[in-house]
């Protein structure tokens, strides 16, 4: 079983990764999701995957999601939340699909924690 932290879950690569995970529940478990501000898409992903944590780096979007969502997934916000997803103990692999510089710092943090990077 691969335990994955998915950074950039609402983008094209992230959405495809979610589809693959849903099609292979005995092989892939998404433990953490992270996105910028697509709170409605992230909420759908949370409901489908039931990760341990989910992050929106846009704090306003995170506040909107927190008001609506009352499940077990912990909702985090901002860069601190993104770093938590990148270094999450429950994941052995970080799939870094964030665009540009925004993904560099969390990816480096994941490497420093010994995570596999995809």
PLM features: residue spans?
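N-terminal Rossmann-like dinucleotide-binding module
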Residues: 1-54
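Gly/Ser/Thr-rich beta-alpha loop segments that engage phosphate groups in nucleotides
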Residues: 12-16, 102-105, 116
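Glycine-enriched alpha-helix->loop->beta-strand junction motifs that scaffold or abut catalytic
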Residues: 49-51, 90-91, 115-116
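Glycine-rich nucleotide/cofactor/substrate-binding loop typically near the N-terminus or early
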Residues: 31-37, 42-80, 86
């Amino acid at each position: 079983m691969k335990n994955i932290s998915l950074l950039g879950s609402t983008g094209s690569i992230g959405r495809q990764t979610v589809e693959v995970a849903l099609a292979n529940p005995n092989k892939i478990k998404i433990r953490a999701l992270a996105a910028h501000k697509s709170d409605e898409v992230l909420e759908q992903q949370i409901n489908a995957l039931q990760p341990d944590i989910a992050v929106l780096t846009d704090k306003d979007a995170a506040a909107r999601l927190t008001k609506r969502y009352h499940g077990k997934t912990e909702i985090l916000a901002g860069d601190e939340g993104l770093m938590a997803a990148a270094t999450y103990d429950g994941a052995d692999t970080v799939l870094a699909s964030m665009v540009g510089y925004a993904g560099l710092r969390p990816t480096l943090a994941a490497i420093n924690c010994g995570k596999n990077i995809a």
